[in-house]
Swiss-Prot record:
Signal peptide: none annotated. Its EC number is 2.3.2.27. This is E3 ubiquitin-protein ligase RNF220. Residues 277-297 are annotated as: Disordered. It comes from Bos taurus. Residues 514-522 are annotated as: Required for targeting to the cytoplasm.
Amino acid sequence: MDLHRAAFKMENSSYLPNPLASPALMVLASTAEASRDASIPCQQPRPFGVPVSVDKDVHIPFTNGSYTFASMYHRQGGVPGTFANRDFPPSLLHLHPQFAPPNLDCTPISMLNHSGVGAFRPFASTEDRESYQSAFTPAKRLKNCHDTESPHLRFSDADGKEYDFGTQLPSSSPGSLKVDDTGKKIFAVSGLISDREASSSPEDRNDRCKKKAAALFDSQAPICPICQVLLRPSELQEHMEQELEQLAQLPASKNSLLKDAMAPGTPKSLLLSASIKREGESPTASPHSSATDDLHHSDRYQTFLRVRANRQTRLNARIGKMKRRKQDEGQREGSCMAEDDAADIEHENSNRFEEYEWCGQKRIRATTLLEGGFRGSGFVMCSGKENPDSDADLDVDGDDTLEYGKPQYTEADVIPCTGEEPGEAKEREALRGAVLNGGPPSTRITPEFSKWASDEMPSTSNGESSKQEAMQKTCKNSDIEKITEDSAVTTFEALKARVRELERQLSRGDRYKCLICMDSYSMPLTSIQCWHVHCEECWLRTLGAKKLCPQCYTITAPGDLRRIYL
C-alpha cells in the first residue's frame, strides 16, 4: 500500500510557508486508503527533503526527551481487517497543528484536513460551517437522537464523500449492525472514538444512548411551582393530590382563626397581632419551602405590617371622633328643631281659636281662623310677646371706667355760650338748669382767668387800656395764685415760676399748639372718642355750644374728656 502518495501533497500545504527546515518527516495513512488492499507495496514519496520511512523514529518538536507522543496520546490498537500489523501512532492523525512538526504537510490526511479546522472534517460549504456549534456553547441534539433505536451517524472522507449510517435501516436488522460496525471502524482508525466504543456491542451503545437521554431529561425535571420541589415523573400525580389537600385545608384554618379572634371580650391588641401574623404568613407555605417562609416572615415585613396597622388605627380613631361629633351636632340640631316645632305648635294652638265675649256672648275671632292670622292676610302685626333677642345686653354708651378711669368732667363744667339776643340766652340757661337738675354750676374756670374774657362783653374804656388788660390776662398763668400787695416774697417766687415756664416754652419752641386758640396748651385735654387734644377751656366752650369735637365733629360728651400731660 502506498502510504506516501495519498498522504502528502506539499504543493498545497498551508502550514509550511517556508522551506522544510527539519530533517524529520512523518508518514501517515489516510482513512480513505485504509480500506484498500494492504498488499499494494508502498511507494516512495516525491523528493521534497530527506525521505524517512515509517520504521524510523519520529522527530519530536520538544526539547525534553522524556516528553513523547506516547505520553500525550495512547496508542490505538489495530482494527481487525484493516491495519493488523501496523505499529504507528494513529493518534497523530488528529494531532492539532500547534503540536505537529513544522515540516509536515497535513493537508490531505484523510478526513482530518488541518487546512480547515484541525482535527475536524473540512467545511465543504457555508451551510456545513454554520451547522457546527461552538465549543463554548451546549451541544445541540440531532432530531434523530431522540430515537434511541435508530442511531444516526454522518461521516465524510478526504474526497468529499459522505457516509450516512442508521437513517433507513432499523437497529435490529443485520444490515444496520454491519453498517454501524463499518462506521465504528472508520472512526476508530481516525482516532475520533475510543477503543471501548469501537469494540462495544449494539446493546451497550443503546444503553449508553438511553443514559445520555435520561441525563438530558434530568436537567429538565419538573419543578413544583408552589413549593419549588424537584419531582420525578412518577411523583407528579401524588404531589398534585397532596397540594390540593393542603389548599383545601387553608380556608378552614383561616375561618377557625377568625372565629377565635372575633370572640367577645378579645382585646384589640390581640386582634391586631393576629391580623399581622395572618397577613405575614404566605398562602403557599409548605414544609418544603423554608426559604420562602424566612422571606415572608422577615423582620422588615413584620415592621411594615405593624406600622400600617397602627396608621389605620389612628385614622379610624379620627374618623370615629368626627362621626361622633357629627352625630352629636345632628342630635342637637334635631332637638332644637323639635323644640322650635313644639313651641310653634303650642303658639298656633293657643292662637288658633281665640274666643272673646261681647254682649254676654262668646265669639271666635275671625282672624284666628285664617292660616297665619293677620300675617297670612297680608297685615303687619306686632307680637305682644317680648323678643328674646332684645337690646338689653347692648351697651350703647359703653362703660369705659375700667379702661380709662372715672370721668373727670361733667355737664356742670361746660361753659355755656352767650348769645347776642337775651331770649336765646334765657332759653340756654333754662335748658342748662334742666340738665343740671338744679345743681350749682362748676367754678373750674372763672371769667377772670379765662383766655376768652375779652370776647364776653365789649369794653367802654380806651382801646389801649383794654389791649393792655387783655395782654395781662393772656399772659397770666392759671396755676399762679392771686398775689396780694403785702407779700413781696410770694410775688418774687411767683415771678420765678413764671420765668421758668416761659423758658420751657421757649426751649420747646412752641411745637405743640392748640388748634382752637392757636396758643400753647394751658391744660391739654383729649377725648376718648377721637383722641384729639385741645385746651381745657377750648373743649368746654365747644361742648357748651354743641356736643361735637371741634376738629372732626365726632359726638363727644363731657364725660369723654381726660387730662393728659405733655
